[in-house]
């Protein structure tokens, strides 16, 4: 493992600005997910990523490595892989700091201790029956004022009792001693194929947040190749109604809700991360509109105002280092312009977040088959200075 250096690779935008690529770590194996927060309280972003059979915190801005957990036998009934497939942050135990949640066959959490860089973080199980969890996101699903966890269970009935399903999980009253979290399967067997990433938001304006998902298909994953959303009922612990947005979508992976054109209706931004193309669905009828049919394997997606003009833009990257990292500039009315900011950089996970505290959103990338974690520096406020 190598870390802590700056690689200057300049990629021009259409307007002439350039994004600099900062390398946080390089590995001998795949890195699928990375998250950022300030854990040591120095006002600078740190990064947690899973690689080389470990979960590691990289202390910014020099990116010194602190091992938080080493995967091994006996921690769960499921054999772990060398790295998590996805991760997120949540203050699980309500003590005011960000704990780490990961999916590595088992969904687990690591408790952030008072001495955050002083040694391992305590490993605890969230759920060991949910398998094939490509996405973990947090939100208040039942609107009780407490943050919940949303996780897909994308494996078949041969491997789990919750096959091809979507779930949300409540934190138990005492998460330190609980054997698992409180699981609600809201789409039981209703998400066939290889379900990937989820989105959260009230789509139909009934005041209850809904959940979206996408799934790739193929011979190994029958029933996939769709984008869909599930409507939350009055009782969120019961089954939710599925609404298909589109079928015959080879490689479908990502779908996130937002009002993209400023008309007051929720739209969806989507990608085919195991196929080709970026698109959006214009609400309320969800008319499918192709944005960039050429980009290959746009496996990661995040939404954010990247140019600080008051509307939401999007960023994605090819999962393997075969194509580009690009953001799509929104004119506020749903017309998107592709801006290439890197090339030959793989990404399984991309986050739009201000990494250098300069007031604009940068791009944090877990490089997948590029075997690295990098961040791309938004030049917006550099130009203004």
Task: Put a short name on every predicted segment.
Residues 9-17:
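Hydrophobic h-region of N-terminal signal peptides that target proteins for export
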């Amino acid at each position: 493992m190598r870390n802590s250096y700056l690689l200057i690779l300049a990629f021009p935008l259409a307007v002439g600005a350039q994004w600099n690529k900062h390398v946080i770590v390089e590995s001998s194996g795949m890195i699928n997910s990375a998250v950022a927060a300030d854990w040591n309280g120095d006002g600078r972003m740190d990064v947690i990523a899973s690689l080389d059979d470990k979960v590691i915190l990289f202390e910014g801005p020099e990116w010194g490595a602190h091992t938080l957990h080493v995967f091994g036998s006996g921690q769960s009934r499921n054999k772990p892989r060398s790295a998590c497939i996805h991760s997120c942050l949540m203050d699980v135990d309500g003590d005011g700091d960000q704990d780490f949640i990961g999916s590595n066959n088992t969904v687990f959490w690591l408790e952030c201790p008072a001495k955050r860089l002083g040694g391992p973080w305590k490993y605890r199980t969230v759920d060991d029956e949910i398998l094939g969890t490509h996405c973990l996101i947090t939100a208040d699903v039942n609107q009780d004022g407490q943050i919940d966890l949303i996780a897909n269970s994308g494996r078949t009935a041969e491997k789990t009792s919750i096959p091809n399903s979507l779930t949300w999980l409540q934190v138990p009253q005492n998460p330190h001693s609980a054997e698992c979290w409180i699981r609600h399967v809201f789409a039981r067997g209703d998400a066939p194929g290889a379900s990937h990433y989820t989105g959260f938001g009230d789509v139909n304006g009934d005041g209850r947040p809904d959940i979206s998902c996408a799934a790739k298909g193929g011979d190994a994953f029958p029933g996939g190749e769709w984008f869909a959303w599930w409507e939350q009922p009055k009782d969120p612990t019961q089954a939710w109604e599925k609404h298909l947005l589109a079928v015959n979508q080879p490689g479908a992976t990502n779908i996130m809700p937002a009002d993209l054109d400023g008309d007051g209706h929720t739209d969806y931004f989507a990608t085919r991360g195991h196929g080709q193309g970026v698109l959006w669905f214009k609400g309320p009828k969800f008319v499918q509109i192709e944005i960039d049919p050429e980009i290959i394997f746009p496996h990661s997606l995040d939404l954010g105002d990247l140019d600080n003009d008051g509307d939401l833009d999007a960023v994605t990257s090819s999962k393997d280092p075969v194509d580009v990292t690009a953001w799509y500039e929104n004119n506020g009315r749903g017309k998107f312009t592709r801006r290439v900011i890197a090339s030959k950089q793989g990404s399984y996970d991309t986050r739009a977040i201000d990494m250098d505290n300069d007031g604009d959103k940068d791009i944090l990338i877990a490089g997948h088959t590029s075997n690295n974690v990098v961040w791309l520096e938004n030049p917006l406020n550099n130009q203004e200075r």
